[in-house]
Amino acid sequence: MNGPGLGQMSLFPPEPAPEPLLCWLWLAHTLGAGSGHAGQVLDAFGGAQEAWEARESDAFRAAAGIPAAQRARLPGNTPEHYRAFARRCAARGIRILPYDDPDYPLAFSRIPDMPLVLYCTGDPRWLNEPATIGMVGSRKPTEYGQQAAAD
């Protein structure tokens, strides 16, 4: 029988790429709020999906500033873990704006370590208007603050 040997073919289809929004949520959670490494990761990889694909590399770990103690958690933390969270946000009328979204505020993109995702209600185009009002949350909330935000 002619054809490729078993070493040349895969018995399983290639794993599909995760949805871009889920990759942004994964990257934002992996780096953590206020990590100071968002700009380095985007400079090195271009976007969240590319960072996901490079997650096992030393280059990703260096750009992300992930200490050795935290490296073990990366393989189990996949973009798919954020699907239910994204659905809950959508059900509550909360829009998730990743860094590459056209409605992401231009002023935020100029911050050296910008938030990788923003959560908003209403029309996000107002965020690019000269006079805006925003609600700012803590990068290190108290337990009470976390519970209040969840409710």
Give, region by region, the residue ranges found by the protein language model.
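Short, positively charged patches
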Residues: 2-151
